[in-house]
């Protein structure tokens, strides 16, 4: 098994066949919807909230609402449907979450997407939840995770998952690899490749994305969608608190298993950082799309599928030539 990460890889260009990158199509079909780019903001409290979810859906971007205000989820689904928008929620795996799924069916509140969101997704309780959702809400598209092995992907797909989320602790504010000794931190791209080879359904690469070029690399190694936290932190629309230090504006960004999210210092696997204020998220998404169009032009194609066929080289941490990002 090859072990490498995003900074270890450079994709090799093919002959360009377009006159302008505006000819290039970056759209992706995922579940029942088609989205402008294969990118989704992480379902974290400092990344996504209701106003941003509405904006993303209205503008044909995928989103996954976080699960940290569970009592608001039924009203959120209803509100999105009243706006003729898709509803995409997260659930955990505790007993009351099984009851919650039953209640949604009873109330005929059927979200288009349900993400089962726990740190170690290769577990029997996740399999039980997948099977429960598929039995009670068969029309919902079920995303399960997070995982880091082919065995996990196969098990969750067999249970009925429509997509799996790959990545255990590679994110900027996740310290699972430090606290537990386990995870895909430092070799996330290799883990993605390993898992994608076993997958028969879509894969979401989750974590470790530091640059827009990493999106293209994720597609090359098997991702259908790329979940990103840090690049989406710090915007006007980001729910994180705006703070000022030494005359510079920042927004806070913390992991889903941090004490800042949990409100307690038990089983902490996340940390809090301050991200420089970045302005509008619309500008960031536009730049991502344009950079992805350029990536596809270098791949010699007009669609995302061209990225899957390019050759690559391993350069072992040298692509930045010693420069820090």
UniProtKB/Swiss-Prot annotation:
Binding site for NADP(+): 203-226
Keywords in alphabetical order: NADP, Oxidoreductase
Catalytic residues, chain numbering: 174 (thioimidate intermediate)
Catalytic activity: IMP + NH4(+) + NADP(+) = GMP + NADPH + 2 H(+)
CDD domains, alphabetized: IMPDH
GO process terms (BP): purine nucleotide metabolic process
InterPro entries: Aldolase_TIM, GMP_reductase, GuaC_type_2, IMP_DH/GMP_Rdtase_CS, IMP_DH_GMPRt
Presence of the UniProt keyword Protein transport in the record: no
Gene3D superfamilies attached to this UniProt entry: Aldolase class I
EC number of the protein: 1.7.1.7
Pfam families found in the cross-reference section: IMPDH
One of the record's GO molecular function terms: GMP reductase activity
SUPFAM superfamilies reported in the protein's UniProt record: Inosine monophosphate dehydrogenase (IMPDH)
Classification via PROSITE patterns: IMP_DH_GMP_RED (PS00487)
Keyword Nucleotide-binding assigned: no
GO cellular component: cytosol; GMP reductase complex
Function per UniProt: Catalyzes the irreversible NADPH-dependent deamination of GMP to IMP. It functions in the conversion of nucleobase, nucleoside and nucleotide derivatives of G to A nucleotides, and in maintaining the intracellular balance of A and G nucleotides.
UniProt-listed NCBIfam families: GMP_reduct_2 (TIGR01306), PRK05458.1 (NF003966)
PANTHER family: GMP REDUCTASE
Family: Belongs to the IMPDH/GMPR family. GuaC type 2 subfamily.
UniProt name for this protein: GMP reductase
Native source organism of the sequence: Latilactobacillus sakei subsp. sakei (strain 23K)
